[in-house]
């Protein structure tokens, strides 16, 4: 009788032990591969512009003790006509609360840059601000979810002081530079 109980116990352990081992291996693979992390994207809310080829880079400078956040992005014009970029902003503010950098010359980022249809420009060192206009401070390996906001004119606009605004949703991991 005792042999049968031992055999039943061994069969139980062998059957369910393999199942438990398989579950542990699947959980370990999920933790290692992290499929739940959002991909790095840059997606404009309206057609005519792209910025995900290559994905934007968000970084902090090693020499910057405060950990101020900066962005590099490549802006492609597919709007069908030449545009002139006036101002650029990186922010984590909700869409309706985007700070207006045009009112503060200290936050002016990009001079007038012409982009013809099908061409691109690289925006480098774009500082990131929160909804109050304060610099965003972060650290390496954090995930950034925010917006790239661009004020621009079409080359043939009647009044260049009236600017168009486009916003791109950006998700990226923060790296360290320098």
Predicted regions span which residues?
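N-terminal export/assembly leader peptides and their processing motifs that target proteins to secretory
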Residues: 31-178
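Hydrophobic membrane-insertion alpha-helices, especially the h-region
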Residues: 18-31
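N-terminal leader/signal peptides at the extreme start of proteins
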Residues: 1-8
């Amino acid at each position: 009788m005792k042999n049968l109980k031992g055999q039943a116990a061994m069969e139980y352990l062998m059957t369910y032990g393999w199942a438990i081992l398989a579950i542990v291996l699947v959980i370990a693979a999920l933790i290692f591969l992290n499929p739940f992390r959002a991909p790095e994207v840059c997606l404009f809310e309206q057609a005519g512009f792209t910025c995900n080829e290559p994905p934007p880079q968000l970084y902090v400078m090693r020499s910057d003790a405060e950990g101020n956040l900066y962005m590099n992005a490549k802006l492609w014009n597919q709007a069908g006509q030449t545009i002139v970029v006036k101002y650029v902003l990186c922010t984590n503010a909700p869409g309706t609360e985007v700070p207006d950098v045009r009112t503060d010359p200290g936050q002016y980022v990009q001079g007038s840059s012409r982009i013809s249809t099908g061409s691109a420009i690289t925006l480098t060192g774009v500082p990131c601000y929160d909804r109050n206009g304060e610099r965003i401070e972060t650290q390496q390996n954090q995930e950034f979810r925010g917006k790239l906001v661009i004020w621009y004119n079409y080359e043939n606009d009647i009044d260049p002081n009236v600017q168009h605004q486009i916003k791109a949703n950006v998700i990226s991991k923060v790296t360290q530079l320098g």
